[in-house]
Amino acid sequence: MNATALLIGLGPLLGWGLFPTIASKIGGRPVNQILGTSLGTLIFAAIFSMINGLAFPAGMDLFFSILSGVGWACAQIITFKCFTMIGSSRAMPVTTAFQLLGASLWGVFFLGNWPGATAKLLGAFALVLIMIGAKMTVWSETESAESAGIMKKAVLLLAVGEIGYWAYSAAPQATAIDGMHAFLPQAIGMVIVAVIYSAVVTIKGGEISPFIEAVSYKQIFSGFFFAFAALTYLISAQPDMNGLATGFILSQTSVVLATLTGIWFLGQKKTAKEMTVTIIGLVLILAAATITVMI
């Protein structure tokens, strides 16, 4: 692995690691966050496509690419809602664990991954590590019945959101184009969902329309971080860079940065014991991610 490949591989660490913290710091409601983030991603993707002269997909390639973006936006709305419930430092490890579980199970049952008894045994061990790690990251020394109920609700919501994240990663596999050509249509799908969601909130009334709130457009900045991470991951996963396996592992390190910056910069405090358990949980999740791609 050369220095250039390593730097590109660490792009998702910075982009996806800082994205949840920046989006939470800028503030606003989930509708503001998804609208701004999607617009930021669209701007980034459009500029990238124009600079590189990428042809715009058509037919089913376009459909599945847009569907991918729709899935991500739906899932991200749920994740943003969970940020308000339990904080990004707790939500991110859980949603990362669900994404790893979803991707692994999809690969085993539908793509023929992990052939042989040994591979399946190692894979099952990795999945157990993921679940243990996720549980450890949300552990609390003192938790009231009310906060425990909120946590359970958030975890269930994040599990539902995994359907959207699964569509985000699985839909492009049905196309005949690479990730860079799918990037702009994905962003269009994200904006479609964000605009519809914002319109529904506006029509329902009772709340300020997100279209006229400044915070919605401030969130464009957080969208640049998400888009940067998505693009550098696509480049990192190329065979002549880090390859899919190493690129994926490097990208998953973002959960560590997202969790720690949420604790340090958003006031999502943990006791010394909770911090120790959280870090161990993060290590288990990363170890499991490494196992799943090395089988």
UniProtKB/Swiss-Prot annotation:
<feature type="transmembrane region" description="Helical">
    <location>
        <begin position="220"/>
        <end position="237"/>
    </location>
</feature>
<keyword id="KW-0472">Membrane</keyword>
<dbReference type="Pfam" id="PF06800">
    <property type="entry name" value="Sugar_transport"/>
</dbReference>
<keyword id="KW-0812">Transmembrane</keyword>
<keyword id="KW-1003">Cell membrane</keyword>
<feature type="transmembrane region" description="Helical">
    <location>
        <begin position="34"/>
        <end position="56"/>
    </location>
</feature>
<feature type="transmembrane region" description="Helical">
    <location>
        <begin position="121"/>
        <end position="139"/>
    </location>
</feature>
<feature type="transmembrane region" description="Helical">
    <location>
        <begin position="276"/>
        <end position="293"/>
    </location>
</feature>
<keyword id="KW-0813">Transport</keyword>
<comment type="similarity">
    <text>Belongs to the GRP transporter (TC 2.A.7.5) family.</text>
</comment>
<keyword id="KW-1133">Transmembrane helix</keyword>
<dbReference type="GO" id="GO:0005886">
    <property type="term" value="C:plasma membrane"/>
</dbReference>
<keyword id="KW-0762">Sugar transport</keyword>
<feature type="transmembrane region" description="Helical">
    <location>
        <begin position="244"/>
        <end position="266"/>
    </location>
</feature>
<feature type="transmembrane region" description="Helical">
    <location>
        <begin position="154"/>
        <end position="171"/>
    </location>
</feature>
<feature type="transmembrane region" description="Helical">
    <location>
        <begin position="183"/>
        <end position="205"/>
    </location>
</feature>
<dbReference type="GO" id="GO:0015144">
    <property type="term" value="F:carbohydrate transmembrane transporter activity"/>
</dbReference>
<protein>
    <recommendedName>
        <fullName>Putative ribose uptake protein RbsU</fullName>
    </recommendedName>
</protein>
<feature type="transmembrane region" description="Helical">
    <location>
        <begin position="5"/>
        <end position="24"/>
    </location>
</feature>
<dbReference type="InterPro" id="IPR010651">
    <property type="entry name" value="Sugar_transport"/>
</dbReference>
<feature type="transmembrane region" description="Helical">
    <location>
        <begin position="63"/>
        <end position="80"/>
    </location>
</feature>
<feature type="transmembrane region" description="Helical">
    <location>
        <begin position="95"/>
        <end position="114"/>
    </location>
</feature>
<comment type="function">
    <text>Could be involved in the uptake of ribose.</text>
</comment>
